[in-house]
UniProtKB/Swiss-Prot annotation:
Ubiquitously expressed. Belongs to the RNR ribonuclease family. The lineage of its organism: Eukaryota, Metazoa, Ecdysozoa, Nematoda, Chromadorea. Residues 73-188 form the PINc domain. It is found in: Nucleus; Nucleus, Nucleoplasm. Its EC number is 3.1.13.-. This is Probable exosome complex exonuclease RRP44. PANTHER family: EXOSOME COMPLEX EXONUCLEASE RRP44, RIBONUCLEASE. The keyword Iron does not apply. InterPro entries: Dis3_CSD2, NA-bd_OB-fold, PIN_dom, RNase_II/R, RNase_II/R_CS, RNR_Ribonuclease, Rrp44_CSD1, RRP44_S1. One of its GO terms (biological process) is rRNA processing. Residues 479-809 form the RNB domain. It comes from Caenorhabditis elegans. Residues 325-337 have a biased composition (Acidic residues).
Amino acid sequence: MDLNVKQSGIHSVALHTTYFQNRSGKVYKRAEERYLRNDLSCGLAQCGTCKDFGTNPLLKIENPVRNAKVGRHALIVDSTSLIRFYDLFDSSLLRDLIVTQTVWEGVKAKAVPAYKKMNSLCYEDAKDRFHVFMNEFHCETFSESSKFEDLSRGEELLLSTALYLKTHWQKHNVAPVVLVFDEDSKKRMENHYQHVMYLKEYIQNLEDPGKQALLDQMAAYESSGNGNEKQIFDEYLSHDRIMEGIASGTIKRGNFSVSRENYREATVIIDDQLTSWFITGNNCNRAVNGDTVAVQLLPEDQWTAPEKKIRLRDVEEYVKTADDMGNEDEENDDENDEPKAKKSKKMTVSTAKVVGIIKRNWREYCGMLLPSTVKGARRHLFCPAERLIPRIRIETEQAETLSQQRIVVAIDHWPRDSKYPLGHYVRSIGEMGSRETENEVLLLEHDIPHAPFSESVLDCLPREEWEPDLTENRGPLPRVDLRDLTICSVDPLGCTDIDDALHCKQIGEDLFEVGVHIADVTHFVRPGTAIDDEAALRGTTVYLCDRRIDMLPCLLSSNLCSLRGEEERYAFSCIWTMTSSADIQSVKYHKSLIKSKAALTYEKAQEIIDDPKEQNDVALGLRGLMKLSKVLNARRTGNGALTLASSEVRFDMDWESRTPKKVMEKQHLDTHSMVEEFMLLANISVAEKILEEYPDCALLRRHPVPLKESYKPLVEAARHRGFEIIVESGKGLADSLNRCVDKKNPMLNRLLRMLTTRCMTQAVYFSAGTVPVPQYQHFGLACAIYTHFTSPIRRYADVIVHRLLAAAIGADDIQSGLLNQARCTKICTNINYRHKQAQYAGRASVQLNVVRYFKGKVETCEGFVMGVRNNGIQVFVPKYGLESIIVLQTSAASGTTIDVEEMSVKVNGDVVIKELEPVTVRISVNEKNQQRPRVELQLIKPAIPGLSVDFDLSSSEGLGL
């Protein structure tokens, strides 16, 4: 935000002159009038002079901070301290802080993260501890000419404020203390003012035991080196050189993505989304997963290729000795060694190096301290839960206390001479291994908003005894009464947030009326309200194994919006007239009032359909829906829609202890496909309607066509099994997958479809009008246009689509901002992110509960080889949805060799393991490391000499795994 002053109480006018230099080096002079005021508050609560200036005094010095070096005081902080240590100011130990206008503008210009934190602290999170003082508009503190020749302009303005406030507060016995970062600055200012301190010096003199945590946060900066150490990484190019390189095409901008198999390798997806460059070793140059980086292509003779080798920090740390783990000598570590193997030209890929960071993706990371054998050591390595993030070096004197806890650490900076980024301890989450702590880590790591709904959100809810009223309308069109229709819902067992229900009835010789009825969430969630803002922030409901984190409060999600059986509910209905061949004759949309005749599970609905004795209206409607769904499915697959596969399991939970009793692979029923087909049809129909009405701002969902190169793992795997995969079109891909059937290996087709899923791009929400129309298509569904309409209880995208459709048919007014393309794009950015994070959180929850389930158990299972690497195999266990690495120690003596090109493992020349073939494994939990128990696979059949333990790759998070 920008700071402004009131337009009254002007004391005088001064001329303020600034000089600036353009890119060609020419110097310009700019002069502007400054209206100086005498009514700007000093911020002191006791100040009788300033109390009538209409501001809220914040500095309540009657409850002073106790500091051994100064008495009653307030703090004036310089910009460098705020920029370097902005996280420290979250602490309530630092209060009665004054941020001058000069410092505010300096931080804003130099450091966006620090500015955002400062803005949040001053005006939201800690406004009772901060006061912004407009020193450059105050008649007593503004100075155009220099009064102190030995001070910089910034130092002089800071000192001017301190001297004024010292005099102004004299009768209150309060002194301002100036906090600075730079030693030279402190010495210069002390020539003119008594109370100047380093930030660290001030904290050291606090009379509060909590100061140690603040000192730990500062310690990382003191250990960053004096510039004489060996430089490990290249220096970044300047901002100007990067911009010039991007303009000329010699430098590209892209997103840095670390390999899940080899932490020394990464890929940069260039901004055009059509190009990717490979980066390895020190050429990653301090980039962290998710950073936006500037990259430069290396000369072709320096190109290389992925090692096809499993390199996980967990693996390498597991085989190190305890002494190695505690070793502080970074030069002795081989993490930064470059790969030695020279690739043939035919095997290489476009290889680049990071030459600069355009935007950091740093955040606060959950994890744990690695053990150190150096007694009393201050420097420690922090192991993030997210495996794609490097170890972080922190300094703390609380290591013994924190060793059994999950903690949060932030990265501060990454010097060229440090193998690891340097950071600081932020806070503790809880005891390592406890269910509550590990779940909290999971949610924090995936940035899942999970705080209880605020009072302002709950105030938006209707009364719990609310009942529908057919005459209650939000727009000019009346709500249609559909309570006489035989409508039912079909959902998973235990579902309480029922979004959708269906009906089907024959209305002619070859005509059927089919309806999809969706919960009318937008009747309750109105634009611009606190509940709408919260739903927009959360973006989606998150489903974990042992809990659900709702997008909307329970009163709506599980009651008033949920289409429960035998209860009247508001709905948004999409009703088709179609033939028995599923040819649509007409479609209509209206807000409605329905009464579901039954809330069925998938299993119960299947049972009713299959039982010829069931002849009631619900059974007849379900059978009609099933017949039509099979026609719709055949048509979609005929057009090239893909049928993909993934590993899905469900847990039978003990809800008292929140522990898994049983793990089951999800079974697919025809009723799953039945419901899916009509949800897809409704989404497509609504997409067509809102795009027709709002071609520049309809919220749609597209699935980009994957790059041909991304299919390589699939194509190679199929080729080694004797099948050809066609990737030139969606239909070609679908048809070739259908042909990949091996009677000796019934799982082969499913495994290939799982590999296909991994080759796909991510489907995304977008605003119509922001990409060319041909790119609107949804590749996986083989349809030209698509959106999400059918789940507004758990997806905010559907809420927006409901509003667009309601406006299009006159069922509701067009709300402010609804038709704004820029606003739609902003919403899409957030819900794309939230959707992705919710998926990752769900998978991490499965893996965490698999570990809990196997604690104290050992089981032998069938697995399938999903990949062969130079030092191990990747094994998928369908029964538990578990995919892990078994590391093989090959040697000439054992006769074991791995052929990555042929995707096989050989013993004495004979192939014993091939990709996509079954193996027998033993599953258990390895608890040798008390801090980090993990699932372990051991190969039982075929027996291979030199077997090591596994390290789970199915989730990058490593939450307890």
